């Protein structure tokens, strides 16, 4: 899974660069925050690994200097049947709500970006999280690469996922 996640992140970076992005900071933000394989990422990126000391958790390092955010490899929130990985921040959280809204990592991280007026341009991951992204922001670009099926998932081919992510990242950044 590390190699595929790294390929998907690299594809998003390549699409962003193709659209004219000059600077990219990758926040490795799943589990140990040391999942991505840096040597397999584009040489022009910077990568933030591990957990920062600020309150933004998965969005550590964000500030008003960012023109946009891309979320790759996201999954549905806890209390859903949309992904076998569904949880919010950690497996101990049964449910997180903000103003009565089921708050997935997508919602929490979108709000963190909004604190600095940074738009979320693209979300990739399971179908459930992509549908939630569209409800949250109808103009957002999404790439569903899998869909939940009980305790399993059905995914598109890994190479097709990479292709779609690169294409949509370029479109999202250019837009």
Feature roles, as predicted:
Residues 31-44:
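Glycine-rich loop at the start of a catalytic domain that most often binds anionic cofactors/ligands
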Residues 57-60, 150-158:
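Short, charged, surface-exposed secondary-structure boundary motifs
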Residues 41-62:
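A glycine-rich helix N-cap at a beta->alpha junction
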Residues 161-175:
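C-terminal accessory domains and tails appended to enzymatic cores
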Residues 46-49, 139-147:
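Short hydrophobic/aromatic-enriched beta-strand-loop microsegments
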Residues 91-116, 125-128:
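Active-site glycine-rich loop that binds ribose-phosphate moieties when present
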Residues 29-30, 72-78, 127-129:
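Short glycine-enriched loops at secondary-structure junctions
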Residues 1-14:
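Short catalytic helix/loop segments, enriched in acidic residues and glycine
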